[in-house]
Regions:
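Carbohydrate-active enzyme catalytic cores, enriched for enzymes
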Residues: 1-10, 61, 67-166
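Active-site core of glycosidic bond-cleaving carbohydrate-active enzymes
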Residues: 1-72
Length: 166
């Protein structure tokens, strides 16, 4: 459902997540980040953050008790994916970069991340009410915010849109 997200309806994702989430053991260092992404996609932001923190803390808090054997590099990458694909709602379906950002549950929470896409650097900053897209490097980049197409250029590098997801 994550990798081929456009092949599932929102309702199918929600039904599947609600069915499988209680059955999933979560005993892999890779479970939490993907569970967080799907939780965010189906609108359960609090659960997304809970799963996301488990991925982030995998090594920092020695969750599995095995950091002495080495770091969980894939879980670290999964933490970034949870932030960008999960809470940021980033997708690259059919070669089109789009975002369906989720509203953070905390009043003062801000999520900011860079994305390099086709040689252009985009910064995404998600606040409580708005998301700001800024073209940091490059000439021109077309993205989608939910269903709206946005053209960012050197002359007009910034766009602010309301956050409706979450």
């Amino acid at each position: 459902m994550f990798l081929l997200g456009d092949a599932f309806t929102a309702e199918a994702k929600k039904r599947n997540f609600e069915f499988y989430d209680p059955l999933t053991t979560g005993d892999s260092s890779l479970s939490s980040c993907v569970e967080a992404i799907i939780a965010a996609q189906v609108g359960d932001v609090e659960k997304a953050i809970r799963y996301g923190l488990a991925a982030i803390l995998m090594d920092l808090a020695n969750v599995g008790g095995n950091v002495k054997d080495g770091c969980h590099i894939a879980s670290m990458g999964g933490s970034w994916m949870m932030m960008t694909y999960g809470l940021g709602g980033m997708r690259d379906d059919d070669g089109n970069l789009s975002f369906w950002p989720r509203r953070a549950p905390e009043d003062n929470a801000i999520l900011r991340f860079p994305v390099t896409y086709r040689g252009q650097m985009l910064e995404v900053e998600i606040g409580l009410e708005n998301v700001k897209y800024t073209l940091r490097e490059g000439i021109s980049l077309t993205i989608r915010h939910e269903t709206e197409e946005i053209q960012l250029t050197r002359e007009n590098p910034e766009s602010v849109r309301p956050v409706s997801g979450g």
